[in-house]
Amino acid sequence: MARLQQSFQQVTLKNLAIYRELNLICQAFQAAEVPLIVLKGGYLATAVYPHIGQRAMGDLDLLVPPQQLPQAATLLDKMGWQTKRPYTIESRLEHDLHLPKLRKVGSPFEVELHWNIVRPGQSNEMLPDALWPHTIPFSSAGPAASAFAFHLQLIHLIIHVAHNHQFSFDLRSLHDIALLLKKHGESVEWHRFVDLVQKWGWQRHAALVCCLICQI
């Protein structure tokens, strides 16, 4: 029990540090007029979980429009978020969905700057511009921050589990989805969920994840 309590306290302190930095990032992006979507744990820890210490985060995932990626990367660099790994924006846009992990001296976490939620060149590729109409305000991160609307949040979590990580995950990933449905299931616009899953070709992934969720 003591170890669990210690772990809970450590996660809580780390997440509080993440949210402090997230608010600073949101302020800088707002001043520069760079739209920002908070992804995965950065949203779920306060919007879905009962307590901020119940959802561990290894990094902070953020998404910006691809055309503003250079500006966003420069802003983060000025705030101390940097990588020693050489890269070019053009190459990353062509082959990946986020920049190399960014680290800041003294920070216990990393930042991943995304412009999409799937890699380019796949049969069920999603254009980044198609994501932005499906957002909601996320006040925990700041007045200008957004998160995916519940139907797209669910799709993203399904893609993250079933496609990006090929079901190589711990139970936290499924727990994220189960809690999202428990807390916000009635607010999910299911017709939009079905339309987008069919449009983007994620039916099989969604069915597999839903079968697993039903057994939790």
Predicted regions and their residues:
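Conserved NTP-donor binding/palm subdomain of two-metal-ion nucleotidyltransferases/polymerases, i.e.
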Residues: M1-G58, V64-I216
